[in-house]
C-alpha cells in the first residue's frame, strides 16, 4: 500500500483481521452537502434544481395582486462575494455572509382588455439581505463566534397508524388511530372510541364523527357505505327470502335451516355452526342461492334505499336497521330486492355504519358548517366561509404541503405503487386512510412503530435554512400584495415593492437564536467533529425533554449502522441527542442510510449499496466478521444474521447483504476507544463523552494504543493543514508554509504557488489554544491531501487528545480512594499535562451623556508602577506578564458634577480641572488570573482618530500581506525563468540584450544577464520569440494582479470598523494562561474511568520497578471489576508492549546496528504477529531509519473496535518486547525500598486532562452580593457567591448542641443585615464581638404569613 508523507514516518501496527472494503467517508459531508444544495452557489439560471433557496422562491412567487391586474414573478438569484474572509469575521465580530440579489419581473396587465393583455414588463435585481456562508469545516461565523447547526431527527411526514396500548379506557380495549402529518399544514387524526365509532380531529381540536368529513368531501351515505362494505342481496319470494350466496360469508354463522345440495343431500344440518369444511362442500356443490325465512334479515342494516315499487315512497333509508315493522311494509309493497350490509364480528365490523348513525349532519353544507364551528367556535358560519376554510385546510398548496417525502411515505403506507403525487390531499387519499384504519381494526394489518428510523428523518442545515427563508418570504408576500395595487397606478419598480427586512430578520433569527444553532464545542478536534455529526430529536417541530418517553430514547434495531447506540449525553437528554454512525449518510428524502456489501448465493461481491431502514427490512444481513475463504465465499454452515429487525442464524445461500465494517455500528468518538468490545456500554458512553472534553496539551502525544480512526478524525476536522496541491516545500517557518506546486497540478492562468498561513496561539470557543506546527522541512515533496502541519491535539496527523502515562493499578496509602488519582511530580516537571488557555478581555469606549470615554495612559489616582506595562496610548504591551488587578487598557469616563468640599475646591483651584471630572474605568485582569499578553486588537469607529497602537498593528498586518504576495511573485517569477532557461539554452540568438547575431545561448550567458534583459533577446526561431513575449506578459500580469490584491487588503484594513451604536473604540486583549495539572483537576482514560487528582507525590516516593523506573500514575484497582470496563487493562498491557518495543528500537539505534537488522525487527513487529501486513520493503533505508527514530518512544498500535488484538497477540507482543507476558511486575515502595507483596499490573494508558479544572471552579468570598428579597448571599462562582449552610448542616450543629455557632451561621454570616455590617466593622477595628439581630428571612416569613390574611407580630418582652 502507498503511504502518505506522515504515515510512512510513523506506521501504526494494525491488528485488524478484516480487509478494508470501504474507506470511512468524509465525516463532515452531512453538513457541507446539505448547505451546498441549499445555496446552489455556482449554478446558472438553467442549472438551478428545485431545492433550497430556489425552491423557496418558487413556492412563494409569482405574487398576484388582489385585483389580478399585476403580478411579480421570480426569475433567478445570484450570490455576491463576502466582504471579509472567515478569520477577519471572527476578529471583527461580524457574520461571514454573502449578499443575496434576486431578479424579479413585474408584469402589469391591461385592465380594459378581456384576455389579460400585458401592458408593461419591468425586470430588476433586488437586494434580499445577507445569507450566512458555511466555512469549509461545516461551521457558520455568526457575529464573530463559530456556531454549528445541529441536524434534527423528526417524525417524517406521511400517515401513521397507532393504538393507545389500552391506556385510554378502563377495560384495556385497544383504540386504534390514524394520523396524517404534513410537512406544513393542519394535522388530520382519525380515532376509534370505546364504542367502535370512528371520529376525526383537525389540529387536535374537538372530535367529530368521521362521516362529517366524508360528507364535507361530497360523499352521500350510500357512496360511503359502497366504499367500505360489500352487500348481501336478498330476493323476496313470497314468505321466504332467497339469498345470493357467497359461501365464504357464511363462515361462523349458525344454519337456520338444513342446507341441501342439488341431489337433496344435507350439507349442513339446522342449528349447526358452519365451518371451513362446510364452505368447501358448498363451493363444490355450486350452490348459488339459499332459501332463508323472512326474519333472517331482522337486525341487518340496509345498504340501499328501499322504495315502494308502485308509489315511489321511501320505505327505509339506507343504513337503517331492519325491524318487523319495515319488513311488514316490504312484504305489503311487494318489494322484489333487499340489499343489506355484510358485517360480522371477526373481520368486517360495522364501524363506519355505526358512525353514520350517530352523525347529526345529512348533507355537504351541514357537514361544512359543523367543521367551521369546530375550527372557529363563536363565529357565525356562512356557506362561502365554510367552503373556503375547508378547502384551505387540506387542499390548498399555499396552506398545506405533504412534501415529496410525505407523499412517498403516504402512498407506500396505503399500498399504492407510485411514489410521486400532489403535495395536497385529495378525497381518495382520505378514504384510503380510513379504509386502512378500519382494516387494521378488523385485524387485517399492523400498526406502525414510530421509533423505527423509516418513520423518522433527518432535517439538515440546508432544509432548516430553507424553511426559515420561506417563512420570511411569506411575510414579504403579504406586504407585496398590498403594494402591487399601487404599482399599477403609480408606475413603481420591483425594488419599491419588496422590503427585504422580514427575510433578513428570519434568517438572522434562525442562525443567531434557534435552539438548533449552537455555540460550537471546540475543546479539541473530536468535539468539533462530533458536534457537527450530532442528531437531535429536540428543537422546533421536535420533542421536548419533559414529554419524551422511554421508547423514543431507547436504542432501536434500526439504529444499527445509522445512529450510534453508545454516544449520547447522560442526564435529561439521554437518547434524545445522538451521534451519526461512522459510515451513515442521508438519502434524498432525509432518511439515514448505511452501507452494505451485496452477497449473491453465498458469494460476497465488491459491490456496495446504501440502504435506508425501510429498504433493508426484507434483507438477510450478515456481520462484517462472517468467515470467508479466499474466493470470498461464506464458509460457515449457519451465519449470524439480522433479518426483520431480529438477530438470528441462516444458511449462507439465504444471505443477501453483509456489513462493510465492524465499526459501522458506532460513532466516531466510540470508534476511538480501543478494546471497546471489552467495556460495559455505560462506561463506553462516558468514555466517548469525556474524550470530547479533553484539553489540548502543550505537546500532543499520539496514543500508543489507538484504533486507526485517529488519522481520519484529524484530517477531516480541519485543524491540520492539508496540501491543496502536490509539490515541493519552498520555505517553511513557524507561521507559514510555502509550496512550489508541481507542474502537472498547475492549471493555466493559476499561480504555481500555494501559501499556507498557520494559525498561531488563537483562542477557541472554549478558551483553549489553537496552534499549528509545521511537520515538513524545506525541499520535502508532498502529495495532494498530505498533512503538512499539526493543529491542537494532533501529532503527525493523528488525533492525540492526551498523554501516554506509565500507570500501576494498586491501592496506595488511601490516596486513590474512590477513584482519586495519585500523580508523580515528574508529570508536572515534564509539562505532560500543562495546557494553555487563552482569555479574551474587551474594553469598550463609549459616547456617554457627559462626553466620550477616552482610552489613555493618563489615569487619575494611579501610581507610576501600575502604568509601566502600558504604552503611550494606554494599551498593554504584547508579551507583558500580568497578574490579577493589573491594568490592561487605561480608560477614563467623564463623571457628573458632585458637590465639592472646600478642600477639593482648593485643590482644583491649584492643580486645574482635569483630575476630578473623570473616573478610572480601566480594564483590569480579573481575580485569580495570571498570564501573558499575546495579542492586542484595536477597532475604531469611522471618523474617530486612530491611535498610535492601532496604526502600528495595521502596519504589521500590511507587512505580513506584502511578504506573502512578494513570496508568491518570487516563486512564480522563478518558475517562469526556469522554463525559459530550459527552452533557450543551446539555441541561437539573433541579437538583442547585447548579444551578437548567431551567438549560442549557454547558462553562463543567461546568468550574466539581468532578468529584465532576457525579454530583449531576439531568437532565430519565431516560436521562442513568442514564448518570450508571453512570459513577459504573464509576469507583468501577475505583478499587477498581486498589487491589486494588496490594495484591496489595504483598503479593508484602513476602513473604519462597523461598531455598535454609541461605541467609539474597542480594544481586545488576549491573555495566554498556563495551567499545570494540580490536585482537584479531573482526569480520565478512554474507557469511562474518570477521577480527580488527589495528590502529587515526589518522584522518589512513587513505586518503581526493579530497574528503578518509577510509575507516573497510581490508579485504584477497585475501580475496574464493578464497572466492567476491562478494556483499560488490555490497553495497559498492550501499551506496555508498545513502549517496550520502542525501547528495543532505541537501543538498536544507539548501538548503531545495521539497517538490515532494523528492517528484520520491524518486520517481526508489523508482519509476524497477526493483523494487517505492512509493505516495509517499499521504504528506502533512509525512510526506515526515519521510521525507527519516530518509534523510539513506543510503537503505536491500532486495535480497531470489534476487530482488535486478541489475548494471544497481546502476549506475543509482550514477549517480543521482553516484557512479562502476564503484564505484571514486581514493584518497590519508593519511600522504604521494600517490595510490595505481590506483582502489580503496570503498563501505559492514554490519559486525558478534562476541561473541568479546579482553577475555574474554586473561588473564595468574604463579603459580596446579596439576594434582594432574603438578603442571603448568592451562590456560585459567577455571582461571586458564598457557601450554602443548608438544612442538613443545621441539623449537624443542632446534634452537637453548638448553639452559638448555629446562631452565628443563621444571623451575622447570612441575612442579619445590621449584624453583619457591624461585625465587619468590628473585625476591621480588631474587635471580634458580634451582636446578632433579626434575620431578614424571618421578616420574609412574616410577610408571607400576612399575605395569607393572618396577622402576626413579634412581641418583645
UniProtKB/Swiss-Prot annotation:
Catalytic reaction annotation: RNA(n) + a ribonucleoside 5'-triphosphate = RNA(n+1) + diphosphate
Alphabetical keyword list: DNA-directed RNA polymerase, Nucleotidyltransferase, Transcription, Transferase
Family indicated by similarity: Belongs to the RNA polymerase beta chain family.
GO biological process, one term: DNA-templated transcription
Key word Repeat present: no
Cystine connections: none
Reported function: DNA-dependent RNA polymerase catalyzes the transcription of DNA into RNA using the four ribonucleoside triphosphates as substrates.
Listed GO CC annotations: DNA-directed RNA polymerase complex
Keyword field contains Ribonucleoprotein: no
Segments passing through the bilayer: none
Organism of derivation: Pseudomonas syringae pv. syringae (strain B728a)
GO molecular function: DNA binding; DNA-directed RNA polymerase activity; ribonucleoside binding
Enzyme superclass (EC): transferase
Residue ranges the record marks as coiled coil: none
Assembly notes: The RNAP catalytic core consists of 2 alpha, 1 beta, 1 beta' and 1 omega subunit. When a sigma factor is associated with the core the holoenzyme is formed, which can initiate transcription.
Record's protein name: DNA-directed RNA polymerase subunit beta
EC code(s) of this entry: 2.7.7.6
Amino acid at each position: 500500500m502507498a503511504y502518505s508523507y506522515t504515515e510512512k514516518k510513523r506506521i501504526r501496527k494494525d491488528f485488524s483481521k478484516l480487509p478494508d472494503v470501504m474507506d470511512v467517508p468524509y465525516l463532515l459531508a452531512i453538513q457541507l452537502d446539505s448547505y451546498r444544495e441549499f445555496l446552489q452557489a455556482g449554478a446558472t439560471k438553467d442549472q438551478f434544481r428545485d431545492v433550497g433557496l430556489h425552491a423557496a422562491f418558487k413556492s412563494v412567487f409569482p405574487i398576484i395582486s388582489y385585483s389580478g391586474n399585476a403580478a411579480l414573478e421570480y426569475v433567478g438569484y445570484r450570490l455576491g462575494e463576502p466582504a471579509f474572509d472567515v478569520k477577519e469575521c471572527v476578529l471583527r465580530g461580524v457574520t461571514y455572509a454573502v449578499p443575496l440579489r434576486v431578479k424579479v419581473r413585474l408584469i402589469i396587465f391591461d385592465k380594459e382588455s378581456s384576455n389579460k393583455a400585458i401592458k408593461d414588463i419591468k425586470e430588476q435585481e433586488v437586494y434580499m439581505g445577507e445569507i450566512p456562508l458555511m466555512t469549509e469545516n461545516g461551521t457558520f461565523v455568526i457575529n464573530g463566534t463559530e456556531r454549528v447547526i445541529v441536524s434534527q431527527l423528526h417524525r417524517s411526514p406521511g400517515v401513521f397508524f397507532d393504538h393507545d396500548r389500552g391506556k385510554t379506557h378502563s377495560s384495556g380495549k385497544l383504540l386504534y388511530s390514524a394520523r396524517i402529518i404534513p410537512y406544513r399544514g393542519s394535522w388530520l387524526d382519525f380515532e376509534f372510541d370505546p364504542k367502535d365509532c370512528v371520529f376525526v380531529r383537525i389540529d387536535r381540536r374537538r372530535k367529530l364523527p368521521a362521516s362529517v368529513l366524508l360528507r364535507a368531501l361530497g360523499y352521500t351515505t350510500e357512496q360511503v357505505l359502497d366504499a367500505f362494505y360489500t352487500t348481501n342481496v336478498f330476493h323476496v319470494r313470497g314468505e321466504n327470502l332467497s339469498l345470493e350466496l357467497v359461501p365464504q360469508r357464511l363462515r361462523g354463522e349458525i344454519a337456520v335451516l338444513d342446507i341441501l345440495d342439488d341431489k337433496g343431500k344435507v350439507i349442513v344440518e339446522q342449528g349447526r355452526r358452519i365451518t371451513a369444511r362446510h364452505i368447501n362442500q358448498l363451493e363444490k356443490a355450486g350452490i348459488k342461492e339459499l332459501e332463508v325465512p323472512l326474519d333472517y334479515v331482522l337486525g341487518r342494516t340496509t345498504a340501499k334505499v328501499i322504495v315502494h315499487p308502485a308509489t315511489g315512497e321511501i320505505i327505509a333509508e339506507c343504513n337503517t336497521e331492519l325491524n318487523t315493522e319495515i319488513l311488514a311494509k316490504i312484504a305489503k309493497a311487494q318489494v322484489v330486492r333487499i340489499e343489506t350490509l355484510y358485517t360480522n364480528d371477526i373481520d368486517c365490523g360495522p364501524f363506519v355504519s355505526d358512525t353514520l348513525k350517530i352523525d347529526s349532519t345529512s348533507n355537504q353544507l351541514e357537514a361544512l358548517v359543523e367543521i367551521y364551528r369546530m375550527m372557529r367556535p363563536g363565529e357565525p358560519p356562512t356557506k362561502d366561509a365554510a367552503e373556503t376554510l375547508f378547502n384551505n385546510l387540506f387542499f390548498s398548496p399555499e396552506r398545506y404541503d405533504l412534501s415529496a417525502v410525505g407523499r412517498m411515505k403516504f402512498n407506500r403506507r396505503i399500498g399504492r405503487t407510485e411514489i410521486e403525487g400532489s403535495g395536497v390531499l385529495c378525497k381518495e387519499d382520505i378514504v384510503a386512510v380510513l379504509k386502512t384504519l378500519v382494516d387494521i381494526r378488523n385485524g387485517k394489518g399492523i400498526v406502525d412503530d414510530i421509533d423505527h428510523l423509516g418513520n423518522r428523518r433527518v432535517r439538515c442545515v440546508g432544509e432548516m435554512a430553507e424553511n426559515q427563508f420561506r417563512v420570511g418570504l411569506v411575510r414579504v408576500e403579504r406586504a407585496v400584495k398590498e403594494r402591487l395595487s399601487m404599482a399599477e397606478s403609480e408606475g413603481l419598480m420591483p425594488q419599491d415593492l419588496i422590503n427585504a427586512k422580514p427575510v433578513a430578520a428570519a434568517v438572522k433569527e434562525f442562525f443567531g437564536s434557534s435552539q438548533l444553532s449552537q455555540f460550537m464545542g471546540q475543546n479539541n478536534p473530536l468535539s468539533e467533529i462530533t458536534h457537527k455529526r450530532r442528531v437531535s430529536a429536540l428543537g422546533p417541530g421536535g420533542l421536548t425533554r419533559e414529554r419524551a418517553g422511554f421508547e423514543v430514547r431507547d436504542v432501536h434495531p434500526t439504529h444499527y449502522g445509522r445512529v450510534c447506540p453508545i454516544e449520547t449525553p447522560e442526564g435529561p437528554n439521554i437518547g434524545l441527542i445522538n451521534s451519526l454512525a461512522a459510515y451513515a449518510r442521508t438519502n434524498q428524502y432525509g432518511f439515514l442510510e448505511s452501507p452494505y456489501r451485496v452477497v449473491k448465493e453465498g458469494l460476497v461481491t465488491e459491490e456496495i449499496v446504501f440502504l435506508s431502514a425501510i429498504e433493508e427490512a426484507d434483507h438477510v444481513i450478515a456481520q462484517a466478521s462472517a468467515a470467508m475463504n479466499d474466493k470470498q465465499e461464506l464458509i460457515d454452515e449457519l451465519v449470524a444474521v439480522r433479518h426483520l429487525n431480529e438477530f438470528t442464524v441462516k444458511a449462507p445461500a439465504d444471505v443477501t447483504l453483509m456489513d462493510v465494517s465492524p465499526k459501522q455500528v458506532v460513532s466516531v468518538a466510540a470508534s476511538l476507544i480501543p478494546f471497546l468490545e471489552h467495556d460495559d456500554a455505560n462506561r463506553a458512553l462516558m468514555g466517548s463523552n469525556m474524550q470530547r472534553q479533553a484539553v489540548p496539551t502543550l505537546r500532543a502525544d499520539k496514543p500508543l494504543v489507538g484504533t486507526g480512526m485517529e488519522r481520519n478524525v484529524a484530517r477531516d476536522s480541519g485543524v491540520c493543514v492539508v496540501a491543496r496541491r502536490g509539490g515541493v516545500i519552498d520555505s517553511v517557518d513557524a507561521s507559514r508554509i510555502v509550496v512550489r506546486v508541481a507542474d502537472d497540478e498547475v492549471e493555466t492562468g493559476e499561480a504555481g504557488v500555494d501559501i499556507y498561513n498557520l494559525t498561531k496561539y488563537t483562542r477557541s470557543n472554549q478558551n483553549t489554544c489553537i496552534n499549528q506546527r509545521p511537520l515538513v522541512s524545506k525541499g520535502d515533496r508532498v502529495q495532494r491531501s498530505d498533512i503538512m502541519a499539526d493543529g491542537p491535539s494532533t501529532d503527525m496527523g493523528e488525533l492525540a487528545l492526551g498523554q501516554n502515562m506509565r500507570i500501576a493499578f494498586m491501592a496506595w496509602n488511601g490516596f486513590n480512594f474512590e477513584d482519586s488519582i495519585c500523580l508523580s511530580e515528574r508529570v508536572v516537571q515534564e509539562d505532560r499535562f500543562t495546557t494553555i488557555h487563552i482569555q479574551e478581555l474587551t474594553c469598550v469606549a463609549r459616547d456617554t451623556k457627559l462626553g466620550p470615554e477616552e482610552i489613555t495612559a493618563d489615569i487619575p489616582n494611579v501610581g507610576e508602577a501600575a502604568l509601566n506595562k502600558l504604552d503611550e496610548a494606554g494599551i498593554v504591551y504584547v508579551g507583558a506578564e500580568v497578574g490579577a488587578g493589573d491594568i490592561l487598557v487605561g480608560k477614563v469616563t467623564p463623571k457628573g458634577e458632585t458637590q465639592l468640599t472646600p478642600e477639593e475646591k482648593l485643590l482644583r483651584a491649584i492643580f486645574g480641572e482635569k483630575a476630578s471630572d473623570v473616573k478610572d474605568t480601566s480594564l483590569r485582569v480579573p481575580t485569580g488570573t495570571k498570564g501573558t499578553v499575546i495579542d492586542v486588537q484595536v477597532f475604531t469607529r469611522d471618523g474617530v482618530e486612530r491611535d498610535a497602537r492601532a496604526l502600528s498593528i495595521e502596519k504589521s498586518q500590511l507587512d505580513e500581506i506584502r511578504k506573502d504576495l512578494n513570496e508568491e511573485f518570487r516563486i512564480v517569477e522563478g518558475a517562469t525563468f526556469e522554463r525559459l532557461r530550459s527552452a533557450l539554452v543551446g539555441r541561437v540568438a539573433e541579437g538583442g540584450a547585447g548579444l551578437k547575431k548567431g551567438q549560442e545561448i549557454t547558462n553562463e550567458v543567461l546568468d550574466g544577464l539581468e532578468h529584465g534583459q532576457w525579454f530583449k533577446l531576439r531568437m532565430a526561431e519565431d516560436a521562442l520569440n513568442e514564448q518570450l513575449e508571453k512570459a513577459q506578459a504573464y509576469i507583468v500580469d501577475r505583478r499587477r494582479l498581486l498589487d491589486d490584491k494588496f490594495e484591496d487588503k489595504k483598503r479593508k484594513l484602513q476602513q473604519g470598523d462597523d461598531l455598535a451604536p454609541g461605541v467609539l473604540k474597542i480594544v481586545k486583549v488576549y491573555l495566554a494562561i498556563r495551567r499545570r495539572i494540580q490536585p482537584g483537576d479531573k482526569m480520565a482514560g478512554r474507557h469511562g474511568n474518570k477521577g480527580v487528582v488527589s495528590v502529587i507525590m515526589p518522584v522518589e516516593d512513587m513505586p518503581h520497578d526493579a530497574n528503578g523506573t518509577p510509575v507516573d500514575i497510581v490508579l485504584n484497582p477497585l475501580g475496574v471489576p464493578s464497572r466492567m470496563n476491562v478494556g483499560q487493562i488490555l490497553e495497559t498491557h498492550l501499551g506496555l508492549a508498545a513502549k517496550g518495543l520502542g525501547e528495543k528500537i532505541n537501543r538498536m539505534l544507539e548501538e548503531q546496528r545495521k539497517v538490515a537488522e532494523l528492517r528484520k525487527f520491524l518486520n517481526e513487529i508489523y508482519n509476524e504477529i497477526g493483523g494487517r501486513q505492512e509493505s516495509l520493503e517499499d521504504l528506502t533505508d533512509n525512510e526506515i531509519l526515519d521510521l525507527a527514530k519516530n518509534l523510539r518512544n513506543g510503537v503505536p498500535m491500532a486495535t480497531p473496535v470489534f476487530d482488535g488484538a486478541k489475548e494471544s497477540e497481546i502476549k506475543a507482543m509482550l514477549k517480543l518486547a521482553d516484557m512479562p507476558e502476564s503484564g505484571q511486575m514486581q514493584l518497590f515502595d519508593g519511600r522504604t525500598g521494600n517490595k510490595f507483596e505481590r506483582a502489580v499490573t503496570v503498563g501505559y494508558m492514554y490519559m486525558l486532562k478534562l476541561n473541568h479544572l479546579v482553577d475555574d471552579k474554586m473561588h473564595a468570598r468574604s463579603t459580596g452580593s446579596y439576594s434582594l428579597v432574603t438578603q442571603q448571599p448568592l451562590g456560585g462562582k459567577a455571582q461571586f457567591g458564598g457557601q450554602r449552610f443548608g438544612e442538613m448542616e443545621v441539623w449537624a450543629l443542632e446534634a452537637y448542641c453548638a448553639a452559638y455557632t448555629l446562631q452565628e451561621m443563621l444571623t451575622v454570616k447570612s441575612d442579619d443585615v445590621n449584624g453583619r455590617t457591624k461585625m465587619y466593622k468590628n473585625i476591621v477595628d480588631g474587635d471580634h464581638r458580634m451582636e446578632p439581630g433579626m434575620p431578614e428571612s424571618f421578616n420574609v416569613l412574616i410577610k408571607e404569613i400576612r399575605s395569607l390574611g393572618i396577622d402576626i407580630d413579634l412581641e418583645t418582652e
